[in-house]
A protein has these predicted regions:
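Single conserved hydrophobic/aromatic residue that forms the stacking wall/gate
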Residues: 1-14
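N-terminal, intrinsically disordered, polar/charged segments of Gram-positive cell-envelope systems
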Residues: 18-44
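Acidic, low-complexity proline/glycine-rich segments
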Residues: 40-59
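Soluble non-cytosolic domains of exported or imported proteins
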Residues: 50-54, 71-82, 199-200, 280-284, ...
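Acidic/histidine-rich, surface-exposed loop or edge segments in extracytoplasmic proteins
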Residues: 55-73, 184-192
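Sec-exported extracytoplasmic/periplasmic mature domains
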Residues: 65-69, 82-94, 210-214, 294-298, ...
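Extended substrate/cofactor- or partner-recognition/assembly subdomains adjacent to catalytic sites
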Residues: 86, 90-272, 277-278
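C-terminal soluble interaction/assembly domains
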Residues: 248-320
Length: 320
C-alpha cells in the first residue's frame, strides 16, 4: 500500500476494491498454543509467480522491514505493524483479480512492500540483529491487533511525510472515508529530503501538459499561465488553472514526478519550478509523523487513533 511515486499508499487499489466487491476466502489453520498471528496463514504471491504460505507474524515481519526504517521508535514500528496487519486481514476476506490464488502479493503498486530476511540483514549490516529483534518485538507486542472502524478492518493507508497536515481521502481518490480525514501531523526534524525542487524545461512542460490537457493555452509569458490555485485540506494544491484549464494537484504530481501535492510553482523562460514539501499522497498515517509522535511518548494505539479518525484498536479474526 505504498505510494509508487515516493512513499506508500493505496490510491488505485482502494478504488478497484470499492468498485469490484469481494468474496470470502475459506481457510482453516489452527495450532493450539500459537499466537493469534501464528494461527493465521497468509498466501503471498511472489514476483516470480510462486505462492508462498507464511504464518501472519512471519509475513508481517517482512512487510514492516520493507515499509518503515528499523531505526524508528518502537511505538512507531508497532503502529506500522498494526497498519500492515489490518491491511492483510482485510485482503484475506477478498479475492483480488491481480492474484486470485493468493491473499496478497509483493508488488507495491497493488499490495504491501516485502523483503526477505536475508536481504534485510544485508541492508542493515552491523545493525542486523538489533533491527531483526526490534521488528520481531513490534509484531509480537501487537499480536492480533487491528485498526477497526465499526468492527471492520480499515483501509490503513500510509505515506512517508506530510507538510504539517494529512489530506482528506476524498480530495485524492474521490471517495469520502470517515476515518481518512485531514489531521495535524508533526513531522519532526529528521525527515530526509523534506523539501525538494523540480524544474521542468518549458518545452517538456508544454509537451507533457498538452498531452493530457490539449485545451490549455500555453501562449504568452510562462508566468501568466498559472492562476486560481485552490488549496486542499492540508494546504497543498487541490487544483490550479494552467492556461485557462483546471488541473488537479495530483495530476501535476504524476506528470512531473513531484514528491507530494504540497508545492508552490513559479515559471520563467528557464522553465517551470515546483518547490515541494513532504513525500507521498498524504492520506492516512504519516510514517515520519508517527515516529515524531512516538518520540513525544505516544503509544502505538494513540498514534493510530491520531491518524485514523474514530477507529478502535482491537483483536480481529478474519472472516473465512
Amino acid at each position: 500500500i505504498r505510494d509508487v511515486l515516493g512513499s506508500r499508499g493505496l490510491g488505485d487499489v482502494y478504488k478497484r476494491q470499492a468498485a469490484t466487491g469481494t468474496l470470502p476466502i475459506d481457510r482453516t489453520v489452527v495450532t493450539p498454543g500459537q499466537t493469534a498471528d501464528g494461527r493465521v496463514q497468509v498466501r503471498v504471491a511472489l514476483g516470480d509467480g510462486e505462492v508462498l504460505t507464511l504464518p501472519l507474524d512471519k509475513y508481517l515481519w517482512r512487510v514492516v522491514a520493507a515499509e518503515m526504517p528499523a531505526s524508528f521508535e518502537p511505538e512507531a514500528l508497532k503502529a506500522q505493524t498494526v497498519a500492515a496487519r489490518t491491511y492483510t486481514l482485510s485482503k484475506m476476506e477478498r479475492t483480488v483479480e491481480a492474484h486470485p490464488d493468493a491473499d496478497v502479493c509483493t508488488d507495491i503498486t497493488c499490495c504491501q512492500a516485502y523483503i526477505d530476511p536475508a536481504d534485510a540483514a544485508a541492508n542493515w549490516g552491523e545493525n542486523a540483529q538489533t533491527y531483526t529483534d526490534k521488528i520481531a518485538a513490534a509484531v509480537a507486542d501487537t499480536d492480533g491487533m487491528a485498526a477497526l472502524f465499526q468492527g471492520q478492518p480499515i483501509q490503513a493507508v500510509f505515506f512517508s511525510s506530510a507538510a504539517g497536515r494529512t489530506v482528506d481521502a476524498v480530495e485524492v481518490w474521490g471517495n469520502a472515508v470517515p476515518y481518512l480525514t485531514s489531521v495535524d501531523s508533526p513531522e519532526g526534524d529528521e525527515v530526509p529530503n523534506y523539501h525538494s525542487t523540480v524544474t521542468v524545461p518549458l518545452d517538456e512542460f508544454k509537451s507533457k501538459l498538452l498531452a493530457q490537457y490539449p485545451q490549455a493555452d500555453l501562449s504568452g509569458e510562462p508566468a501568466g499561465w498559472f492562476a486560481n490555485l485552490v488549496p486542499n485540506s492540508a494546504g497543498g494544491v487541490e487544483t490550479v488553472d494552467i492556461g485557462g484549464t483546471t488541473v488537479g494537484g495530483g495530476s501535476l504530481r504524476t506528470l512531473f514526478g513531484l514528491r507530494s501535492t504540497s508545492f508552490t510553482v513559479s515559471a520563467s523562460a528557464d522553465g517551470v519550478t515546483f518547490s515541494v514539501t513532504g513525500y507521498g499522497h498524504g492520506v492516512g498515517m504519516s510514517q515520519y509523523g508517527a515516529n515524531a509522535l512516538a518520540k513525544e511518548g505516544k503509544s502505538y494505539d494513540e498514534i493510530l487513533k491520531w491518524y485514523y479518525t474514530g477507529i478502535d484498536v482491537a483483536p480481529y479474526t478474519p472472516q473465512r
